[in-house]
Curated annotation (Swiss-Prot):
Modified sites of kind Omega-N-methylarginine: R68
Lineage: Eukaryota, Metazoa, Chordata, Craniata, Vertebrata
Protein's organism: Homo sapiens (Human)
Metal-binding as UniProt keyword: yes
Keyword Cell cycle: no
GO CC, any one term: cytoplasm
Name of the protein in its database record: Cysteine-rich protein 1
Function: Seems to have a role in zinc absorption and may function as an intracellular zinc transport protein.
Keywords: Acetylation, LIM domain, Metal-binding, Methylation, Zinc
GO molecular function per UniProt: peptide binding; zinc ion binding
InterPro entries cross-referenced by the UniProt entry: Znf_LIM (IPR001781)
PANTHER family: CYSTEINE-RICH PROTEIN 1, CYSTEINE-RICH PROTEIN CRIP FAMILY MEMBER
């Protein structure tokens, strides 16, 4: 029986979500930064951990520079 990488408990077929090559419990597959529940294949991965594509993964690991969340980024109101 496979174990969930988040909670390390057994994952039964009825509650299984497969993502990143592993079987997860549906509520355990969450973005590491914001905690949003993710869907299989609908997210990004960094060092084996799931992240929502936008805004978390893009802000943390995407291109940096003007207008991209880096040091030179500005928000106008």
């Amino acid at each position: 029986m496979p174990k969930c990488p988040k909670c390390n408990k057994e994952v039964y077929f009825a509650e299984r979500v497969t993502s990143l090559g592993k079987d997860w419990h549906r509520p355990c597959l969450k973005c590491e930064k914001c905690g949003k529940t993710l869907t299989s294949g609908g997210h990004a991965e960094h060092e084996g951990k799931p992240y929502c594509n936008h805004p978390c993964y893009a802000a943390m690991f995407g291109p940096k520079g003007f207008g991209r969340g880096g040091a030179e980024s500005h928000t106008f109101k």
